[in-house]
C-alpha cells in the first residue's frame, strides 16, 4: 500500500506542478499578440503593457484567477477563444510572468 501511494505521489507531481500543462506557451503568445492584448494593457498601466503582470497590487493570486481574468478580458474585447486557446494563453502568461505551481 505504501509503495502504491509513493508511486502515485511521484507521478502526480508533474501534473500538480503545471496548472496549464495542456497549454502550449508558443501558441498562447501568438494568440496574445494576434488579439493585440498588450495595447489594452498599455492604456491601463502606460508605457510597458507587460507591467500589468508584475505590478505589486496584482489581482491574479493563482492559476484559477488567471484563467478567469483571461475570460474577462475576452468579453471586454470581443475576442472569442476556445477553451483550448484560453489554456494556451494562460500557459504563455504563466510561463512568462506568473510561474504558478
Predicted regions and their residues:
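N-terminal export/targeting leaders of redox proteins
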Residues: 1-23, 98-101
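Electrostatic cytochrome c docking/interface patches
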Residues: 13-33, 75-78
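The canonical Cys-X-X-Cys-His
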Residues: 28, 34-44, 89, 93
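Sec-exported extracytoplasmic/periplasmic mature domains
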Residues: 33, 71-75, 94-98
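Short cysteine/histidine-rich metal-coordination sites, predominantly Zn2+-binding motifs
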Residues: 52-60
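Short Fe-S-cluster ligation motifs
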Residues: 64-82
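C-terminal capping alpha-helices of c-type cytochrome domains
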Residues: 79-101
Amino acid at each position: 500500500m505504501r509503495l502504491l501511494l509513493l508511486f502515485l505521489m511521484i507521478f502526480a507531481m508533474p501534473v500538480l506542478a503545471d496548472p496549464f500543462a495542456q497549454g502550449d506557451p508558443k501558441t498562447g503568445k501568438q494568440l496574445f499578440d494576434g488579439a493585440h492584448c498588450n495595447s489594452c494593457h498599455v492604456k491601463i498601466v502606460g508605457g510597458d503593457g507587460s507591467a500589468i503582470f508584475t505590478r505589486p497590487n496584482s489581482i491574479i493570486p493563482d492559476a484559477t484567477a488567471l484563467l478567469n481574468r483571461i475570460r474577462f478580458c475576452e468579453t471586454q474585447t470581443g475576442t472569442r477563444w476556445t477553451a483550448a486557446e484560453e489554456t494556451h494563453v494562460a500557459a504563455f502568461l504563466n510561463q512568462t510572468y506568473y510561474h504558478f505551481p
